[in-house]
């Protein structure tokens, strides 16, 4: 029997990951490829929950900076995450994986409301659960949503797949050829060094609850499965030493 390191995970999937090379919008081929990666991990027996972002469709904070009321801008972004969630759900179900979408804002015609106990029950029954609409409140990022939901469902770790970046660096490796990669960090390191991984609210919540985080390159086929099996790829972030 395959030795699985993480038996229940919270996958943080950025909206940009669904855009592929386009950089914005939704690329259905890219979404289908991600769904196949998730299916491979699901087939191992790992329980998977997903928090999906919406940056490929909308960003609330920049909109607020040019005059849009911040709460309204953030709520618009929550609708974007729901669009992404429904597209991902469709790809997963076409791949043969039963999937449920739960939203933090009630949209009963298209998804279940977020109910912790029901989400855990879905996971126990072998369904993938996608959490959409953030926390349901403005001013909170989907990174913070990921940290919150991971703790609520008692996940073993948060898995954060990046586009073309294979871990956490001391500076942007796409802009600095001499950027240094970290293989291990603590959440306190991230806060003290000001590393751009998660926002400080998400990092603090993860640190306070000793929630591990693994950051890896989602674009490399099989990487998600390797992380779940415990291979040392990307960067692993743990509680304070």
UniProtKB/Swiss-Prot annotation:
<dbReference type="InterPro" id="IPR015963">
    <property type="entry name" value="Uridylate_kinase_bac"/>
</dbReference>
<comment type="similarity">
    <text>Belongs to the UMP kinase family.</text>
</comment>
<feature type="binding site">
    <location>
        <position position="74"/>
    </location>
    <ligand>
        <name>UMP</name>
    </ligand>
</feature>
<keyword id="KW-0963">Cytoplasm</keyword>
<keyword id="KW-0808">Transferase</keyword>
<dbReference type="InterPro" id="IPR001048">
    <property type="entry name" value="Asp/Glu/Uridylate_kinase"/>
</dbReference>
<feature type="binding site">
    <location>
        <position position="163"/>
    </location>
    <ligand>
        <name>ATP</name>
    </ligand>
</feature>
<dbReference type="GO" id="GO:0006225">
    <property type="term" value="P:UDP biosynthetic process"/>
</dbReference>
<keyword id="KW-0021">Allosteric enzyme</keyword>
<feature type="region of interest" description="Involved in allosteric activation by GTP">
    <location>
        <begin position="20"/>
        <end position="25"/>
    </location>
</feature>
<dbReference type="GO" id="GO:0033862">
    <property type="term" value="F:UMP kinase activity"/>
</dbReference>
<comment type="subunit">
    <text>Homohexamer.</text>
</comment>
<dbReference type="GO" id="GO:0005524">
    <property type="term" value="F:ATP binding"/>
</dbReference>
<feature type="binding site">
    <location>
        <begin position="12"/>
        <end position="15"/>
    </location>
    <ligand>
        <name>ATP</name>
    </ligand>
</feature>
<comment type="pathway">
    <text>Pyrimidine metabolism; CTP biosynthesis via de novo pathway; UDP from UMP (UMPK route): step 1/1.</text>
</comment>
<feature type="binding site">
    <location>
        <position position="54"/>
    </location>
    <ligand>
        <name>UMP</name>
    </ligand>
</feature>
<keyword id="KW-0067">ATP-binding</keyword>
<protein>
    <recommendedName>
        <fullName>Uridylate kinase</fullName>
        <ecNumber>2.7.4.22</ecNumber>
    </recommendedName>
</protein>
<feature type="binding site">
    <location>
        <position position="169"/>
    </location>
    <ligand>
        <name>ATP</name>
    </ligand>
</feature>
<dbReference type="InterPro" id="IPR036393">
    <property type="entry name" value="AceGlu_kinase-like_sf"/>
</dbReference>
<dbReference type="GO" id="GO:0005737">
    <property type="term" value="C:cytoplasm"/>
</dbReference>
<feature type="binding site">
    <location>
        <position position="172"/>
    </location>
    <ligand>
        <name>ATP</name>
    </ligand>
</feature>
<keyword id="KW-0665">Pyrimidine biosynthesis</keyword>
<dbReference type="GO" id="GO:0044210">
    <property type="term" value="P:'de novo' CTP biosynthetic process"/>
</dbReference>
<dbReference type="Pfam" id="PF00696">
    <property type="entry name" value="AA_kinase"/>
</dbReference>
<feature type="binding site">
    <location>
        <position position="59"/>
    </location>
    <ligand>
        <name>ATP</name>
    </ligand>
</feature>
<feature type="binding site">
    <location>
        <begin position="135"/>
        <end position="142"/>
    </location>
    <ligand>
        <name>UMP</name>
    </ligand>
</feature>
<feature type="binding site">
    <location>
        <position position="55"/>
    </location>
    <ligand>
        <name>ATP</name>
    </ligand>
</feature>
<dbReference type="InterPro" id="IPR011817">
    <property type="entry name" value="Uridylate_kinase"/>
</dbReference>
<comment type="function">
    <text>Catalyzes the reversible phosphorylation of UMP to UDP.</text>
</comment>
<keyword id="KW-0418">Kinase</keyword>
<keyword id="KW-0547">Nucleotide-binding</keyword>
């Amino acid at each position: 029997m395959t030795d699985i390191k993480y038996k229940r995970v919270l996958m943080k999937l950025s909206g940009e990951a669904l855009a592929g090379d386009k950089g914005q919008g939704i690329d259905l081929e890219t979404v289908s490829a991600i769904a196949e990666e998730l299916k491979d991990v699901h087939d191992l027996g790992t329980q998977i929950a997903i928090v999906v972002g919406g940056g490929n469709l909308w960003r609330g904070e920049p909109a607020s900076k040019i005059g849009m009321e911040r709460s309204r801008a953030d709520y618009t972004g929550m609708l974007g995450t729901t669009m992404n969630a429904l597209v991902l759900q469709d790809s997963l179900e076409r791949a043969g994986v039963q999937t449920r979408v739960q939203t933090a804002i009630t949209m009963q015609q298209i998804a279940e409301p977020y109910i912790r106990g029901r989400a855990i029950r879905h996971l126990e029954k072998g369904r993938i659960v996608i959490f959409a609409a953030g926390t349901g409140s403005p001013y909170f990022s989907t990174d913070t949503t990921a940290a919150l939901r991971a703790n609520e469902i008692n996940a073993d770790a948060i898995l954060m797949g990046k586009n073309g970046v294979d871990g956490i660096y001391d500076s942007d490796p796409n802009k600095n050829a001499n950027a240094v990669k970290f293989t291990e960090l603590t959440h306190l390191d991230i806060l003290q060094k000001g590393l751009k991984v998660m926002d400080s609210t998400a990092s603090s919540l993860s640190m306070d609850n000793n929630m591990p985080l693994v950051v890896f390159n989602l674009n490399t086929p099989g990487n998600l499965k390797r992380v779940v099996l415990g291979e040392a790829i990307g960067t692993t972030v743990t509680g304070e030493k």
